[in-house]
Amino acid sequence: MADFEELRNMVSSFRVSELQVLLGFAGRNKSGRKHDLLMRALHLLKSGCTPAVQIKIRELYRRRYPRTLEGLSDLSTIKSSVFSLDGSSSPVEPDLAVAGIHSLPSTSIAPHSPSSPVASVLLQDTKPTFEMQQPSPPIPPVHPDVQLKTLPFYDVLDVLIKPTSLVQSSIQRFQEKFFIFALTPQQVREICISRDFLPGGRRDYTVQVQLRLCLAETSCPQEDNYPNSLCIKVNGKLFPLPGYAPPPKNGIEQKRPGRPLNITSLVRLSSAVPNQISISWASEIGKNYSMSVYLVRQLTSAMLLQRLKMKGIRNPDHSRALIKEKLTADPDSEIATTSLRVSLMCPLGKMRLTIPCRAVTCTHLQCFDAALYLQMNEKKPTWICPVCDKKAAYESLILDGLFMEILNDCSDVDEIKFQEDGSWCPMRPKKEAMKVTSQPCTKVESSSVFSKPCSVTVASDASKKKIDVIDLTIESSSDEEEDPPAKRKCIFMSETQSSPTKGVLMYQPSSVRVPSVTSVDPAAIPPSLTDYSVPFHHTPVSSMSSDLPGEQRRNDINNEVQLGTSSDTVQQ
C-alpha cells in the first residue's frame, strides 16, 4: 500500500512530457490535455500495473527530480533509456531526454576517474550543456513530518491525504500539482447523513472534507498558511477562497487569512469515482508549502463549552495563591500594592459574568465569560484574550473556582476588592451611599421649612395673616446677624399683591425667623429687612413714599399685627 501511494504521488508530479512517455510505454493513448493524461496514468496505476511500468515510473521520477546516482547500474540504466527515447515517435521525448540529463547536478557525478567509463561517456556526450546548467536546489521530501495545529471546532475522523509537499517542478514562477483521493462507503454515508439543506438551495455538512495548507516546517505545529497566487480546483471546478484581509500598513501586500477550506460541496460523494484536487501557486524563494486533506466533524460553541465544563473547575486556592503573590510587598520597590480591585463584568459582552474563565498562560485575575468567548471564536477564530490581548487557546482555558464562589455569594455587586491575605470584599457604588445619606437630610430640611410658618399662622383670615406676617418688619430698624441666602427665600406669596409690593416681599425672611423668637419680648424681633445682606441693592421699604396706593392701609394692618403678636406672647 505504501508503494502504491508513493507511485501515485510520483505520477501526480509528472509534467505532460513524462505522462506521455509513461502512457506510450504502457501502450495507452497519449494524446489530450494534462488532466486527461493524468487520469489515464492514475487509472493505469490503480488497475494493477506491471513491474515494468512501476520501474518506468520510478525512472521518470528520478529524471524529474535527480539527487544522487548510486552505482554504475543506475547510470547505465538512465543512459540506455535516454538513447532508447531517440527513436520514439513522440516529438517531445528528445526534449525530455535532454532535460533529464541536464537537470543532473555536477556534484552528483562523483566518479571522474577512468574507473567509471560509462560516467565519463555520459559527461562527454553532455559536456557543452552540462556546464551551462546550475545545480538544482535540494528537493523537499514528498511526505514531510509536518504537524498542523489542532482546530478546536473540528474533530478529525480520518486522513484522506497526509501532509504532502508542494514541490517546485520547474523553473517557472507559477507551479501546479494534482492530488487524487477516494472516499470509502462508510465515509460517504457519514457525510450524507450530516447534510442539512439551507435556504437558497445551499447545503451544509457537519461532517466535512477539509483541505489545509501550511508551511513545510517541522520545528513546531504549523498554522494554516496560503502560498501566493493560490488557485484551487476540485474535480475541475474552481473553489472560492477567503477574501483578502486588510493590510496592517500601507504598502504591504494583502494576504488571505489562513484557515481550513471546506471543499465538501465540490467533492463527489461516491466511493466508485475518485476526486481530484488541482493546486496552482506562485513559488517563493526559501518557502515550501505542504497540503493535506482530512475528514472532520464540525463542533459548536455549546459542545466546546460542555467539554470545558467536563474538564472541571480549578481549585480556588490557586487563585488565592496568585493574589497573595501579586500583593506581596517587594522590598526593592518603593510602591506597595495593598489591595486589588477586579470587575465582575465580562469585557466582551459588558454583562455580569456567568461562567468565569481565563487562560492558564494569563497573569491577570480578571476573567471573561466562557460562553461569549467561544461564540466569538466560532464566528471568527482568533483565540486572543480580551483582557491582555495575548494568545488564549482553547486547550489552555480554565474555569476559575474562586470567581465561581464570589458570583454565587454576591449577586448585586459588579466589583470586588482582594486583600493581601487572599480575602475579598464587595465594592458598593458611591451613588448608592450618597442616596442613603441624602434622604434624611431632605426630610429634615423639608420639615424645618414647612413647619415653622405653621407656628405663626393666625386663626383668623389665613391669606391675610400670611401677608401680615411678611409685612411685619417694614418699620423696624434694629441690627441683627446675617442669615444664609438660602433661608431668605419667602415661601408665602399673595397673588393679589401689586407688582411694586411683590418686588419687596420676595426677600422677606420673617416667616422663618418668627418661630425662633416666640419666647422673648416682641422688641427683640428683627424689625427690618435693611439689616440683612442681599445679593443686590433695592430700595428700602421705609424710604418709599406714603402716597403709594394702599400705604395707609398697610400701616394700619401693621399696627394690628403688632398688637396681636403682643397679646399672643402674653397668653403663652
Swiss-Prot record:
Zn(2+) binds at C362, H364, C385, C388. PROSITE patterns: PINIT, SAP, ZF_SP_RING. GO terms for molecular function: DNA binding; nuclear androgen receptor binding; nuclear estrogen receptor binding; nuclear glucocorticoid receptor binding; protein domain specific binding; RNA polymerase II-specific DNA-binding transcription factor binding; SUMO ligase activity; SUMO transferase activity. Residues 558-572 have a biased composition (Polar residues). Changing L304A: Loss of enhancement of AR and NR3C1-dependent transactivation; no effect on interaction with AR and NR3C1. A zinc finger (SP-RING-type) spans 331-412. Keywords: DNA-binding, Isopeptide bond, Metal-binding, Nucleus, Phosphoprotein, Transcription, Transcription regulation, Transferase, Ubl conjugation, Ubl conjugation pathway, Zinc, Zinc-finger. It is found in: Nucleus speckle; Nucleus, PML body; Nucleus. Binds SUMO1 and UBE2I. Interacts with AXIN1, JUN, MDM2, PARK7, TP53 and TP73 isoform alpha, but not TP73 isoform beta. Interacts with STAT4 following IL12 and IFN-alpha stimulation of T-cells. Interacts also with GTF2I, GTF2IRD1, IKFZ1, DAB2 and MSX2, as well as with several steroid receptors, including ESR1, ESR2, NR3C1, PGR, AR, and with NCOA2. Sumoylation of a target protein seems to enhance the interaction. Binds to sumoylated ELK1. Binds DNA, such as CDKN1A promoter, in a sequence-specific manner. Interacts with PLAG1. GO terms for cellular component: chromatin; nuclear speck; nucleus; PML body. The keyword Cell division does not apply. It comes from Rattus norvegicus. Residues 11-45 form the SAP domain. Its main location: nucleus. Mainly expressed in testis. A motif (Nuclear localization signal) lies at residues 484-492. This is E3 SUMO-protein ligase PIAS2. Changing K380R: No effect on auto-sumoylation. The modification Phosphoserine is found at S476, S477, S478, S499. Changing K390R: No effect on auto-sumoylation. Its EC number is 2.3.2.-.
